[in-house]
């Protein structure tokens, strides 16, 4: 399991706030169609986010990496990748997942780490 040794906080929540040094975010498997996970580190740190096994169809669902808090306009949409890494410019990063109603839940996971 590639999450061995990493903090796994209440798997499958639809949104949460993470402030730990590192951890894993799993997709939400319930009925909600939009989820926001915000990662916020101490001001001196940035965030390295590793995205694994994203195979979304962007017409029906999407995963968006937002630089900063949820209301920030600087974002990148991810549709299909087996592995990608993103480093924040600030100490805050938000991940937004949206899907159309009745579209099946995804099977991705995200690993975040605090970096200087």
Curated annotation (Swiss-Prot):
Record keywords: Disulfide bond, Fertilization, Secreted
UniProt protein name: Spermadhesin Z13
Subunit structure: Homodimer; disulfide-linked.
Record domain CUB: where: 14-115
Expressed in which tissues: Seminal plasma.
Family assignment from sequence similarity: Belongs to the spermadhesin family.
One GO location term (cellular component): extracellular region
Principal subcellular localization: secreted
Pfam families according to UniProt: CUB (PF00431)
Domain of life according to the entry: Eukaryota
Cystine residue pairs: 14-35, 58-79
Role: May be involved in the fertilization process.
SUPFAM superfamilies per the UniProt record, alphabetical: Spermadhesin, CUB domain
Keyword Secreted (UniProt): yes
Protein's GO biological process: single fertilization
InterPro entries: CUB_dom, Sperma_CUB_dom_sf, Spermadhesin
Subcellular location: Secreted
Keyword Transcription applies: no
Transmembrane segments: none
